[in-house]
């Protein structure tokens, strides 16, 4: 074995190991059977997840909010937190009106792989919309949240002093989410969560297929081998780095 190939092989093994851990995170979400919120790794990279939440009660009732979860490059080993970014600005104290990012620090300060999982983030997203007031009063540990540390001070001020005006501003976010539910995907990825308008013919055809005993065999695609799934977890940046390393090694060998 050439010594030059060892670092590249180690990186590939690390990526495969990371891919299995990401798949395990997705399986845990399925096991938790969370209601009204869904998330799935993208086809192109396991470090990018697509998510959507349906809210049926409270100040944000009837909304459908899309979001993305960006995992750190060394997930789950490194302590830095994942990044949650909503598709559109949502009027909420914990959501930045500029970047649309969600503040996760009330949930946790750093990522601990033996304690934290992506489903914790999904439950936190549910909690901030189900109880906006409660989400700004204290952290998960019961510690008070400094008012100067929220992402949207205007939303915080209205929530504390004028709930009616806060509801009006939140309604704008709700209406936008419903109006753009059926928009074309902003990214070409087979795993992006899309919605289609109700079509009676399609609905009836699907119901007939579900009544068939062989509906699963008729409709379910063949499950790819784990190695194929894991291979899809590698990000484009990491693949480029591997290719560049191989080019450098090949150039060095030719000179020798």
UniProtKB/Swiss-Prot annotation:
Pfam family name, one: UQ_con
Domain of life, source organism: Eukaryota
UBC core domain sequence ranges: 17-179
InterPro entries found in the cross-reference section: UBQ-conjugat_E2_core, UBQ-conjugating_enzyme/RWD
Family: Belongs to the ubiquitin-conjugating enzyme family. FTS subfamily.
Protein name as annotated: Protein crossbronx-like
Organism of this sequence: Drosophila virilis (Fruit fly)
